Amino acid sequence: MQTVMTNSGVELRVESNIIYTTDSKAFWRSGNMLVGNGTVVSYQCHSMDEAVDMVAALYNGRKTEAAQA
């Protein structure tokens, strides 16, 4: 399981093809679609890494390693 902290303080937990957030939302990949909250976030999502980056962008981006320390 991968975890990513965002600049807005929300933590993303990645399990298989689902991304859970600490504000009780979930996003998942289905083919090349990234779906979350009942809407399509992207039709051109080609990997889970790209999906995590897109979801993190919804929360003002990833917190950098230096900022986490």
Predicted stretch roles:
Residues 4-7, 22-23, 40, 65:
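N-terminal compositionally biased, intrinsically disordered segments and leader/signal-like regions
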Residues 1-19:
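Negatively charged, low-complexity tracts enriched in Asp/Glu with abundant Ser/Thr
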